[in-house]
Structures are given as C-alpha cells and as structure tokens.
Amino acid sequence: PAVLIPRPETELLLEAALAFTQPRDHAVVVDVGTGSGALAVTLAALCPRAVVYAVDASHPALEVARRNAAAHQADVVFFEGDLLLPIQERQMQVDMIMANLPYI
C-alpha cells in the first residue's frame, strides 16, 4: 500500500498539536513523514489560520495525502523529500514539528 493506516495514538498527537496551534495566530507546523496526511490535513482543516507543511519521501504517499487534503478542503503545502530536508533547504522557520512515523 502507498500509506499505512493511522494508529490510535495519532489522535493523541493531533490533540497535542491542536492545543499548541489553536491559540496561536498563523502557527507554522510541519508534519514529517505525513503518509496519508491524516495529521496535516486534520490540523489544517481545524486550524485554518495555521500554515501547515507536510513532508514525505514517498511520492505515492504524497499523492494520497494531496487527495485527502483536496477532499477536506484543507490548505496544506506538500514537499517530497527526506524528513526535514525540504524545510532546511528552504531555510523555513517553524513553530512546531510533528511526526507519527511508522515503526514497522
């Protein structure tokens, strides 16, 4: 499969990300290893003032994430690359980095 099914602890990570992001105006968040985009898409949909970036090394995974973002009208900017490299290459400043990487 192009992506893995999000694990139950994904919801806990999302709750923590929301608690950090919601009180801030225009928080900049990066989802590393976005996979299906579950975290990035949900965060962008629930916090429309946030700037959400999603990074994955897998082109097929990013295609799934892009479709999910479009389906939920979530404003997410996607980068293909290894971990934080696309963010570092662009010298981007971020407020929060989140990752729910596979461990299998």
Feature annotation, model-predicted:
Residues 1-2, 57:
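Acidic di-acidic motifs
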Residues 2-15:
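Conserved SAM-binding loop and adjacent beta-strand
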Residues 12-104:
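Conserved SAM/SAH cofactor-binding pocket of Class I
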